[in-house]
Amino acid sequence: MNQTRVFLIFAWLMVAALLWMEWGKDKAAANAPVVAATQSVPAARDLDAATPSAANVPAAQAIPQAGAPGAVPATSTTAATPAAAGAAPVVTLTSDVLRLKLDGRSVLDAELLQFPQTKDGTAPVSLLTEDPAHPYNATSGWASEHSPVPGVGGFRAEQPGTTFDMAKGQNTLVVPFVWNGPDGVSIRRTFTLERGRYAISIKDEVINKSGAPWNGYVFRKLSRVPTILSRGMTNPDSFSFNGATWYSPQEGYERRAFKDYMDDGGLNRQITGGWVALLQHHFFTAWIPQKDQASLYVLAQDGPRDVAELRGPAFTVAPGQTASTEARLWVGPKLVSLIAKEDVKGLDRVVDYSRFSIMAIIGQGLFWVLSHLHSFLHNWGWAIIGLVVLLRLALYPLSAAQYKSGAKMRRFQPRLAQLKERYGDDRVKYQQATMELFKKEKINPMGGCLPLLIQMPIFFALYWVLVESVELRQAPWLGWIQDLTARDPYFILPLLNISIMWATQKLTPTPGMDPMQAKMMQFMPLVFGVMMAFMPAGLVLYWVVNGGLGLLIQWWMIRQHGEKPSKIIQANAK
């Protein structure tokens, strides 16, 4: 198989894959739920009113009560006590990385202070929001069949004031809330924020000073009306996965896009040692329960809202006793280094390089190399260039073998032409004679395909690394490239890519190519140039450097095998 056919296979595989991704976005946009402009969507704080029994979800499975292994609680309903005086005041908690607005039960709004919405803007990304059209919040509540539990507005801050800021030099911000129920039952909830951390610790202590046992379970949910993303290559957000993900030690990492949210009846599964999250481009929210806690994982829809929920085990607090439970709520970016510090199994998969484990592993490896290069070079653009150089060096033996195979095939082109002339239209005899020739001369006609098969998964894994890595978000390279995750504003890199592909095409020997293949080859640089024009600049930078190094390597290989580049260029010009 000559170099040209290998190139064509590689090119058309790329075109097919990119068209498939584009078709997927088109299908997603067509099937996505659309909230009409006149439709009334409850405000974000109204989302808290929907308890597990109010949402359209399956009944809770049996989860053993704490202290009574194997016991099965009755089907849970909510018996929430009304708020003492309407909705609780909204309290603002601010650390160095987060600004949260919450009422003790729900986080209503969350701003990521170190991530501006635009390159030149000052407003931070608002991940959780009270936007009436697309509310998105995180709730932690209590439910019980018979015992009183806090309802909406039930929790109140213990300390006076509505604003709590992490002071300079302070590494931890602790803000307690309390619900005082009837008959001496109370729940003390403590929010803990740490400097530089996006995981919020939430601990509940149930204090029973009544004369009767108290029964209940905690539920934690993420609820949002998904934003309808505009489809297209010019919108990088539409290429990233948007939906729910969860992890279990038994099944591993699983995910469900918003457009397919209720496929197979949603989710209703008991899991120990897992987590649940809602993902979008560069950012995510997640509930992470205690490692040894069994929870019922539920995906459901409540009107226009998609809900991902955990229901903890039911437990009983005897009179005069105290019981506690805690969890972490992640509200922040997909920063690999900070996610690793949480020490949660499988949580690294929220950086969604691929749903396939092998591709995810390749992506994680590429990012590991990329991040280490960045630690030396202090620029993500130069780190990408460094990664290309390392990949080219690692794949050089394969490239050399590929060219050697192609050169050997070209030397035997006259003999293959003689065989074709000898056997005419008898394709069977021609193929038999060809295979005998290959066997005798030790020619592997598929020798040029091995480097292609190895490079394809690396290329696509790198594509997702560059699309998914929030570390590259708004990261400049030099000059006109001020955001490696956005397209080249002046199309300089795509034009360079076209030029390099055209030069590579001219330097590629094409013996025996039929006219149809020749025409296809002429249009390939232009087709790729148009596609690359709207892709992230970091990816096009990779492709330009990779193509440029490939061109130099091909020039070197031609000379090494006794061929003259000028003759190949002249032959291709005919």
Curated annotation (Swiss-Prot):
PANTHER family membership: CYTOCHROME C OXIDASE ASSEMBLY PROTEIN COX18, MITOCHONDRIAL, OXA1
Membrane topology category: Multi-pass membrane protein
A single MF term (Gene Ontology): membrane insertase activity
Species this protein is from: Xanthomonas axonopodis pv. citri (strain 306)
Annotated TM spans: 6-26, 356-376, 380-400, 447-467, 489-509, 525-545
Subcellular location: Cell inner membrane
One Gene Ontology cellular component: plasma membrane
Main location: membrane
Complex and partners: Interacts with the Sec translocase complex via SecD. Specifically interacts with transmembrane segments of nascent integral membrane proteins during membrane integration.
Role, per record: Required for the insertion and/or proper folding and/or complex formation of integral membrane proteins into the membrane. Involved in integration of membrane proteins that insert both dependently and independently of the Sec translocase complex, as well as at least some lipoproteins. Aids folding of multispanning membrane proteins.
Sequence similarity: Belongs to the OXA1/ALB3/YidC family. Type 1 subfamily.
Name of the protein in question: Membrane protein insertase YidC
Keywords from the named record: Cell inner membrane, Cell membrane, Chaperone, Membrane, Protein transport, Transmembrane, Transmembrane helix, Transport
Top-level taxon of the source organism: Bacteria
Pfam family, one: 60KD_IMP
InterPro entries xref list: Membr_insert_YidC (IPR019998), Membr_insert_YidC_N (IPR028053), YidC/ALB3/OXA1/COX18 (IPR001708), YidC/Oxa/ALB_C (IPR028055), YidC_ALB_C (IPR047196), YidC_periplasmic_sf (IPR038221)
GO biological process, one term: protein transport
